[in-house]
Amino acid sequence: MTHAPTPPAASNFLRPIIEDDLQANRFQGKLWAGKPGPAALQAQGQPDPARIRTRFPPEPNGYLHIGHAKSICVNFGLARDYGGVCHLRFDDTNPEKEEQEYVDAIIEAVHWLGFDWQADGNDNLYFASDYFEFMYEFAEALVQAGHAYVDEQSAEEIRASRGTLTEPGTDSPWRDRPADESLLRLREMRDGKHPDGSLVLRARIDMASPNINLRDPVMYRVRHATHHRTGNAWCIYPMYSWAHPVEDALEGITHSICTLEFEDQRPFYDWILARLAELGKLARPLPHQYEFARLNLTYVVTSKRKLLQLVREGYVDGWDDPRMPTLFGLRRRGYTPSSIRLFCDRTAVSKSDSRIDYSLLEQAVRDDLDPVAPRSVAVLDPLKLVITNHPEGRSETCSAPRNPHDPQAGVREFPFTRELWIEQDDFREEPPKKYFRLFPGNTVRLKYGYVVRCTGFTKDESGKVVEVQAEYLPDTKSGTPGADSVKVKGNITWVSAAHAVPAQVHLYDRLFADAHPDGGDKDFLACLNPNSKQTVQAWLEPGIEAVPGATWQFERLGYFTVDSKDSRPEAPVLNRIVTLRDSWQAA
């Protein structure tokens, strides 16, 4: 059913526009026949149950990325907040680049992000290709009304005649051909009688317009290509600038929300809708286009061409590589749908281009996971610690909260034994100033366990420390009376060497070391971060169930998730989602 109005989560420049439209009853009397269609069909409909209609219109020629997530959240979020409906529409007007694989992936990604398009008994999943017959019918009507003509100039000639920002264009020699002659040529184009690029249908507007987009823009081109849905039924395909307003109007869209690069196209958008409404082809009220700044992140590229190059040339391990900005990459990295929605909600919807710092995305997933992620311990760079006065073969139980934010989550238990694994960084033979962890003679607390005093260490032939020895103080076990009688400045994490679970851990970081890898004339490949992926053999706290998608906060280290692709029950593979705090330093 249609979403009930809910208080908006955040403000942006589109909200006052929608609120003014609703207050002015701009859409009062708007009819909806239960499916998209022209004016004649909608006239048979009922009052539209949706207060507003928006749409997310991806082209099925690639995988969705974090920039698309912003548009998804804006369009679905506004529909939700104002008692409306958001359509998912595939803009499949370019058959040579589109595939069913991408359609399926986009549907999966939008669902994963937490949005649905069903409402009032309608699926609201649409394809531009469903409207090809309407578009062609409308094109003929425009030709007959003198608003369009078939041009036989080459693409180069059309480009040359367009003029410049300071000089008007020149009329095509075919601009004033009789309407019936253009109609005949258009039908020949439709019937496949002309080769690719030989003829185009152009709108007849104004070759002297200061807006180059109104200098008789192309509406249809000949393209003998197989479409992933319509097969070979069509050999002419609409240009996006012609298809876009028609699709919006057929679907009863009220607020067509685009990114800023379409701002200059809005006059043509309005022109198309006005002419077709005058001809009785489209129902009023007509859609209106609004533009907002696309989401640009530092340390990220979202160009499909560049992302494809990264995949094809092996710089990443596919479209779902956890370093990729694709939604599937973020999902595999361990980002939750709610964390991405939170990030999008925290970024402004404005008319001004800007770059959002990547750290805001990382902070969103921290804020999302912190209240819910169970705690555990992992040792990523292990060093053996032997408690020399602890009996061999003896195992004690220590306990810790599963989640300090949720007392109902209970406690977890794990063994304390003579031999432990600690982090290499938690020992120094010669400590620097203000180093409070293990070094000869120093005392620290093994978190949730005992206070220990370092008594020695062992090196291998290369001089590397391979083992540390310590004695524990039996009366200092955490959670027991008198445990705090010995004051220490350092706490370190540990796992039992005999019980820890071995795992491969991928330490992911930003894919690019340059904040603006696609800026200016840079070679974006030269900006890659050589340390964006490091793999270590780690030891995990026993009791961890390494099922795909499971997520933990490993204390002192960050948030980690089980890899959905490579992990196996007998050989866990984990991905670092994000560190506990922002400590980024460019390579």
Curated annotation (Swiss-Prot):
Any one Gene Ontology molecular-function term assigned to this protein's record: glutamine-tRNA ligase activity
UniProt KW keywords: Aminoacyl-tRNA synthetase, ATP-binding, Cytoplasm, Ligase, Nucleotide-binding, Protein biosynthesis
Entry GO terms, CC: cytosol
Protein's UniProt keywords contain Amino-acid biosynthesis: no
Primary site of residence: cytoplasm
UniProt keyword annotation of NAD present: no
Cross-referenced NCBIfam families: glnS, PRK14703.1
Protein name in UniProt: Glutamine--tRNA ligase
Lineage: Bacteria, Pseudomonadati, Pseudomonadota, Betaproteobacteria, Burkholderiales
